[in-house]
Amino acid sequence: MPKLGMQSIRRRQLIDATLEAINEVGMHDATIAQIARRAGVSTGIISHYFRDKNGLLEATMRDITSQLRDAVLNRLHALPQGSAEQRLQAIVGGNFDETQVSSAAMKAWLAFWASSMHQPMLYRLQQVSSRRLLSNLVSEFRRELPRQQAQEAGYGLAALIDGLWLRAALSGKPLDKPLAHSLTRHFITQHLPTD
């Protein structure tokens, strides 16, 4: 008889082991056997919980996107009466949260984006994540700008966030958070009306 709560513990172990493997050898070279060894379980456990490597990658990406959503929402909930500028900075902060810019998370995101072009389930996850970011940004800009301007500003800020993140991921160096926040703050203030 399985121990109560063991499923969530095992899933967490396997997702963490997947992130470690992707960080060290890349998604394509990470094998089920390597991931199982890192997690201290048999390969059969992975099949039991996730079917196969694609199922495990999907669960890993769902976990990372969930962490992203939580990082953004926690910051927004702390600012219920915040200005549009403050709330836009909170969204930026969530996207540059440590859960999203650690070496393992960045490599997993890169692998996820590449795989999403060929795997329908990962593509759907990627689209949900991208739409959520754009929707959140446009919603906040919309508090101060007409619809078309808000959409353009939201799209531009999403591109800036993704671009800063991608440049850091491909550089192999940690994201320069002060610079990233300075650049995004400048973009935001350029697009919001002055008082």
UniProtKB/Swiss-Prot annotation:
Asked if the record carries the keyword Repressor, the reply is yes
Look up and give the organism this protein is from: Escherichia coli O139:H28 (strain E24377A / ETEC)
A GO term (biological process) for this protein?
A: negative regulation of DNA-templated transcription
- Record feature DNA-binding region, as residue ranges: 31-50
- What keywords sit in the KW lines? DNA-binding, Repressor, Transcription, Transcription regulation
Q: What are the residue boundaries of the HTH tetR-type domain, all occurrences included?
A: 8-68
Pathway entry = Amine and polyamine biosynthesis; betaine biosynthesis via choline pathway [regulation]
Q: Which InterPro entries match?
A: BetI_C (IPR039538), DNA-bd_HTH_TetR-type_CS (IPR023772), Homeodomain-like_sf (IPR009057), HTH-type_TetR-like_transc_reg (IPR050109), HTH_TetR (IPR001647), Tet_transcr_reg_TetR-rel_C_sf (IPR036271), Tscrpt_rep_BetI (IPR017757)
- Which Pfam families does the entry link to? TetR_C_6 (PF13977), TetR_N (PF00440)
The task this protein performs is described as: Repressor involved in the biosynthesis of the osmoprotectant glycine betaine. It represses transcription of the choline transporter BetT and the genes of BetAB involved in the synthesis of glycine betaine.
Q: Report a single Gene Ontology molecular function.
A: transcription cis-regulatory region binding
Matches recorded under PROSITE patterns: HTH_TETR_1, HTH_TETR_2
Task: Please state what the protein is called.
Answer: HTH-type transcriptional regulator BetI
The lineage's top-level taxon is Bacteria
Look up keyword Transcription regulation and say if it applies: yes
